[in-house]
């Protein structure tokens, strides 16, 4: 459905935009408790890692939306077989990178 494509494009695009903001060292898109104990000199590195994770999640959602739209038009299951693992893998990898950064620089999630 077209609404699914639009939703995935919006959610994925927002995640990519927020990740890009974080990668510049601007942590304003995060809750304060996610970076409360991050040292000032580590904020840039922390932002890069969290931003990379967020961009990875956003890109996987965006690509998944496009692949599911193609599936709806072609009814070829190959798009599901490619899109679903890509979505799950992107979310898991992106979350892992973000959590790694939080544990490394913030000494925990909270």
What are the residue ranges of the model-derived segments?
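Helix-coil boundary and interhelical linker segments in multi-pass alpha-helical membrane proteins
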Residues: 1-6, 70-78
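Alpha-helical transmembrane segments and their immediate juxtamembrane interface regions
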Residues: 77-110
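Transmembrane alpha-helical segments of integral membrane proteins
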Residues: 61-72
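Short membrane-interface loop/juxtamembrane segments of multi-pass integral membrane proteins
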Residues: 36-50
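Select subsegments of transmembrane alpha-helices in polytopic membrane proteins
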Residues: 47-60
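Membrane-water interface of transmembrane alpha-helices
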Residues: 16-33, 101
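Alpha-helical transmembrane segments
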Residues: 2-18, 86-90
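Cytosolic juxtamembrane segments of membrane proteins
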Residues: 31-38, 104-110
């Amino acid at each position: 459905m077209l609404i699914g494509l639009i939703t995935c494009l919006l959610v994925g695009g927002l995640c990519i935009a927020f990740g890009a903001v974080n990668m510049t060292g601007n942590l304003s898109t995060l809750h304060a408790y996610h970076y409360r104990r991050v040292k000032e000199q580590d904020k840039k590195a922390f932002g890069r890692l969290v931003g990379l994770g967020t961009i990875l999640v956003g890109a996987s959602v965006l690509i998944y939306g496009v692949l599911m739209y193609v599936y709806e038009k072609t009814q070829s299951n190959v798009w599901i077989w490619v899109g679903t693992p890509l979505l799950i893998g992107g979310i898991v990898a992106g979350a892992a990178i973000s959590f790694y950064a939080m544990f490394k620089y913030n000494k925990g999630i909270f």
